[in-house]
A protein has these predicted regions:
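A detector of single, family-specific signature residues
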Residues: 1-313
Length: 313
């Protein structure tokens, strides 16, 4: 309780001892599950870090390709494979310059593209090959088709593939780790949650049983409405607190985005989002309100499910 700001081993020991004495009745034994939760949270933070790296590498590659093969990144929209590879990236690695396509005849390119799809195990479409060839005839590159340009692009492709591979490895490892948690089955049943967002949610929320009520978990996420009262004054519309975990709020917004895109008509959170949007509420208002409702449902379902399990688990 000193006014001085002291940082030493002795002062730290006193703080830890005081905390233990104050919280003695509430402290629980550290378990293997706590270690798994800490590992999952660390993996999630690494996942976020490498996702930023992947985005930066992707933008870097697109910027270079705009000088050799503009728009090639828009030809395919298939998601990344389990090894991190993407069709448009592999295509750009092979056909790194517009002259790689238009210097061939249409039949020669179609045949070459078909063999490439077979070798890379991608679906082949003759109409797609004709579309690519037709667009290539209209493009004007800036950089020449030589070994220097080729090396620049191949280096950018390798960097993106490396980051993408790490992201997919972490995604798989996080799902495998989260599957060991008792709440995994009930969380994965919720709309808007899948093998990627589910583990991220469990990583950031942690052990639900440590929250005493629904308001505690929404406050932890920072999606609870703020309070501004003094005497007889009471502000009606107060922004959310945003005092909690920013990473959890980001994950919740991604879940809300999935709900809006998939539109599950029988889902209460989606119905709530639709209602708020119909009322003309701003984007951040209805997204935050939806996240609040989702967390309350998450808390109730997980708490009920855990209480139904045998005590040994």
């Amino acid at each position: 309780d000193s006014l001085r700001k002291v940082k030493s081993d002795k002062a730290d020991a006193v703080k830890i001892a005081r905390y233990a004495l104050d919280k003695w009745q509430n402290l629980k034994q550290y378990s293997l599950m706590d270690e798994l939760r800490n590992q999952l949270k660390t993996m999630n933070r690494q996942f976020g870090f490498y996702m930023k790296q992947k985005t930066a590498m992707k933008n870097n590659l697109i910027g270079i390709l705009d000088q050799t093969y503009p728009g090639v990144n828009t030809y395919f929209d298939s998601p990344a494979r389990s090894d991190g590879s993407q069709k448009w990236v592999d295509f750009a690695s092979t056909y790194w310059h517009v002259d790689c396509v238009r210097k061939m005849s249409l039949s020669a390119f179609t045949d070459h593209y078909q063999k490439w799809c077979k070798r890379k195990k991608y679906n082949f479409s003759k109409s797609k090959a004709e579309e690519i060839y037709g667009k290539a005839k209209e493009l004007v590159p800036v950089l020449p088709k030589d070994e220097i340009t080729k090396r620049i692009i191949r280096q950018a492709v390798d960097q993106l593939n490396s980051a993408s591979s790490t992201v997919e490895e972490l995604r798989t490892l996080m799902n495998d780790t989260a599957s060991k948690f008792p709440e995994y089955p009930i969380v994965m049943e919720m709309n808007g949650v899948g093998p990627s967002l589910g583990p991220q949610l469990m990583a950031e929320i942690g052990d639900v049983t440590r929250f005493t009520h629904k308001g505690a978990i929404t406050a932890f996420a920072g999606v609870d409405p703020g309070v501004n009262e003094s005497g007889t004054y009471s502000q009606k519309s107060v922004p959310t607190s945003k005092r909690g975990s920013a990473d959890l709020r980001k994950t919740l917004f991604l879940v809300m985005d999935v709900l809006i895109k998939t539109m599950p008509q029988d889902d209460p959170v989606y119905q709530f989002l639709n209602k708020k949007r119909a009322q003309g509420k701003p984007y951040y208002v209805y997204m935050t309100a939806g996240a609040n409702k989702f967390l309350r449902i998450y808390y109730g379902r997980v708490k009920e499910y855990l209480s139904s399990l045998p005590q040994s688990e």
